Amino acid sequence: MARVKRGVMVRKRHKKLLEQAKGYRGSRSRRVKVARETVMKALWYAYRDRRNRKRDFRRLWIIRINAAARMHGMSYSRLMNGLKRAGIELDRKVLADMAVRDPAAFGRVVEQAQQVV
């Protein structure tokens, strides 16, 4: 069996890794060992923060809905309870967008929720 020297594949792998580490400061973009650790950590941060982003946006939507609801004399929890009882199935993302872009329509939704509560 012929002897396989891995020089070509190692260079290919290192090149791919250093390409991923492009833009990092100092030796993190030049040294393979340091670049590997940095890229692995960056990928882990990306994985973690894709999940955290969902939490953060939900929190932001709730804050916006609560602020807009209080301008109409209603708390967030009472508004959500009223919407559920009224059978209005708008999610938090849509409600928050409505509160920011179309306050009049949001006001009408709040009125419907107030009638039920």
Curated annotation (Swiss-Prot):
What is one term from the GO cellular component aspect held by the record? ribosome
Q: Which InterPro entries match?
A: Ribosomal_bL20 (IPR005813), RIBOSOMAL_L20_CS (IPR049946), Ribosomal_protein_bL20_C (IPR035566)
Q: Which GO terms describe its biological process?
A: ribosomal large subunit assembly; translation
Any idea which UniProt keywords this protein has?
Ribonucleoprotein, Ribosomal protein, RNA-binding, rRNA-binding
A Pfam family annotated for this UniProt entry: Ribosomal_L20
SUPFAM superfamilies of this UniProt entry? Ribosomal protein L20 (SSF74731)
**Which molecular function term from Gene Ontology is one that the record holds?**
rRNA binding
List the PROSITE patterns: RIBOSOMAL_L20 (PS00937)
Q: What does this protein do?
A: Binds directly to 23S ribosomal RNA and is necessary for the in vitro assembly process of the 50S ribosomal subunit. It is not involved in the protein synthesizing functions of that subunit.
Q: Which family does it belong to?
A: Belongs to the bacterial ribosomal protein bL20 family.
Note the PANTHER family from the entry.
39S RIBOSOMAL PROTEIN L20
Put simply, this protein is called Large ribosomal subunit protein bL20
Q: Which gene encodes it?
A: rplT
